[in-house]
Amino acid sequence: MEVKLWNDKREREMYENFAELYAIIKATEKLEKAYIRDLISPSEYETECQKLIVHFKTLSASLKDMVPNIERFAETYKMDCSAAVYRLVTSGVPATVEHRAAASASTSSSASVVAECVQNFITSMDSLKLNMVAVDQVYPLLSDLSASLNKLSILPPDFEGKIKMKEWLLRLSKMGASDELTEQQARQLHFDLESSYNSFMAALPNAGN
């Protein structure tokens, strides 16, 4: 006696699609583990992972009414494929692409902070040249510079510029807002800024190239 697993063609297609979805998730889980264990090269991993993601997106779109939640589907069939679910549902791109994007964002962010530091150095030095030596004029500029230097992770805590700006901010905080730097103080501050700027530029990666 023949046992039917489905009642009609539509139900048969549904089960076939379920089986295919199951296979894609399982294959992705195996691929993720192989990549983590260095059993496959990054380029091979990326090619295969991209194929699985494309197949998954196409299939899950056609099954969205029957399988609205992939995580629940995986739980129902006791798949234990958390890496695959993350890759297919949450990330949607191969790990190699994800890592490149993160590195690019980090580089872009660092470049932005470097530009901010340079701008703050130049603004602070220019203001002294223009004889803007009142405490309420100098303090905000040095405060901005100090904050931008502290945002740059490549600079060590004992970086010359960080220490000198902290010393100057402490000195200025003990003065009145309308007090002005003496000619000697202004000259020393400009020297410290210029020295710190040169050290800053030398500390940047590839500064010597």
UniProtKB/Swiss-Prot annotation:
UniProt KW Protein biosynthesis keyword: no
Xref: Pfam families: VPS28 (PF03997)
Annotated ranges, domain VPS28 C-terminal: 109-205
Gene3D superfamilies xrefs: 1.20.120.1130, 1.20.1440.200
Biological process according to GO: endosome transport via multivesicular body sorting pathway; protein transport
Domain of life from the UniProt record: Eukaryota
Function: Component of the ESCRT-I complex (endosomal sorting complex required for transport I), a regulator of vesicular trafficking process. Required for the sorting of endocytic ubiquitinated cargos into multivesicular bodies (MVBs). Mediates the association to the ESCRT-0 complex.
Protein name: Vacuolar protein sorting-associated protein 28 homolog 1
Taxonomy of the source species: Eukaryota, Viridiplantae, Streptophyta, Embryophyta, Tracheophyta
Gene of this entry: VPS28-1
